A protein has these predicted regions:
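Conserved redox-cofactor binding core of oxidoreductases
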Residues: 1-44, 54, 245, 249-269, ...
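Generic recognition of stable, solvent-exposed alpha-helical segments in well-folded globular domains
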Residues: 10, 22-26, 39, 75-76, ...
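Glycine-rich loop(s) and the adjacent beta-strand/alpha-helix scaffold that form part
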Residues: 17, 33, 42, 46-47, ...
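Generic, well-ordered alpha-helical scaffold segments in large soluble proteins
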Residues: 30, 34, 83, 95-96, ...
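Hydrophobic/aromatic beta-strand patches that form the interior of the parallel beta-sheet core
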Residues: 39, 81, 186-188
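Short beta-strand or tight-loop elements
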Residues: 40-42, 73, 285, 293-294
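Short, hydrophobic/aromatic-rich segments at coil-to-beta transitions
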Residues: 52-58
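FAD cofactor-binding and catalytic pocket of flavoenzymes
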Residues: 77, 102-238, 245, 264-266, ...
């Protein structure tokens, strides 16, 4: 999925040369060549539903930052495909009053919550070079039954200065010292497999008073137990690979210099939201289409 790569290391922030074969340079040009009309800076506010069908789309003009500009457009089409992602798709259907007999619209929205761990080595890692995220491990997905304690996938992500500096903890000189070691820094992610246990039900998309979406996602003790085990696994792996320092994604974690130190301290960290760094790049669900409510 790459063509003419310049190896600039900015894949995760968007390719500056369009070598990454995104929709911008593949399917959208093809659609335009075949007669499609692309409306930019236009947002669908509501589907007009009549007799169980979409009769029209009510749209508004928006600025690049999403701020409404006041103009409106009404679109009538034979077929309508809702493809706004796991946040905006259920929000649109909720605003439109779409049929929801089981009251599941917006529910079971999953994130693969991610715990983070970075490590510093004596040698240069250059985590921004080469194809991104080529190594992963499913080992910890299979340690327990799928409906048992939450499992997790380990991935070695690419590094970018902006993503790295906004993801690690610390302030002032401590943070500056960590930034200075960026060339020798390696990172691991643990993606928690949510949605297979009653204590990991996922989140729910709701509407604010202005009709915009919000996601309520509970980071339950069950989920955070998985995050703790993931932090331990990642620190152990990094020290076994020769790391001289490990920085765990937790506000109260010091910089660890040995596996024994990390093992003892991570086991006692309070696994609470905001203290524990949790991120997500996989937003899924929210628009279940099965006839069975289960």
């Amino acid at each position: 999925n790459v063509k003419g790569c310049w190896n600039l290391g900015s894949c995760g922030m968007g390719c500056p040369t369009n070598a990454k074969q995104s929709m911008l340079v593949t399917t959208i040009p093809t659609a335009l060549d075949r007669g499609a009309t692309l409306l930019v800076e236009t947002r669908v506010e509501k589907l007009v539903l009549q007799q169980g069908r979409v009769a029209a789309l009510q749209c508004v003009a928006v600025a690049p930052n999403g701020r409404p500009l006041g103009g409106s457009t009404r679109i009538v089409a034979k077929h309508v495909v809702v493809a706004g992602g796991a946040i905006n798709s259920p929000a649109l259907l909720l605003r439109s009053g779409a049929p929801d007999p089981h009251r599941l619209l917006g529910a079971r929205t999953f994130l693969h919550p991610v715990a983070l761990s970075s490590a510093v080595f004596d040698h240069e890692v250059a985590g921004w070079q080469g194809a991104p995220q080529t190594i992963y491990s499913d080992h910890f997905l299979d340690v327990h039954p799928i409906d048992g304690p939450i499992g997790y996938k380990l991935e070695a992500p690419p590094l970018h200065p902006l993503i790295f500096t906004t993801s690690i903890g610390g302030f002032g000189r401590e943070a500056a010292a960590s930034f200075a070691q960026f060339p020798n820094t390696h990172a691991l992610l643990a993606l928690l497999r949510d949605g297979f246990h009653a204590e990991s039900p996922g989140g729910r998309v709701k509407l604010r008073k202005d009709g915009s979406p919000e996601l309520d996602y509970p980071l339950t003790p069950f989920v955070m137990d998985g995050a703790r085990r993931a932090l331990l696994s990642m620190a152990e792996l990094q020290f076994a690979a020769g790391a001289k320092q490990v920085m765990t994604g937790h506000e109260l974690a010091p910089i660890f210099t040995s596996w024994a130190q990390a093992k003892a301290r991570i086991a006692t960290l309070p696994m609470q939201p905001l203290l524990t760094k949790v991120v997500s790049a996989h937003v899924m669900g929210g628009c279940g289409m099965a006839a069975d409510p289960a």
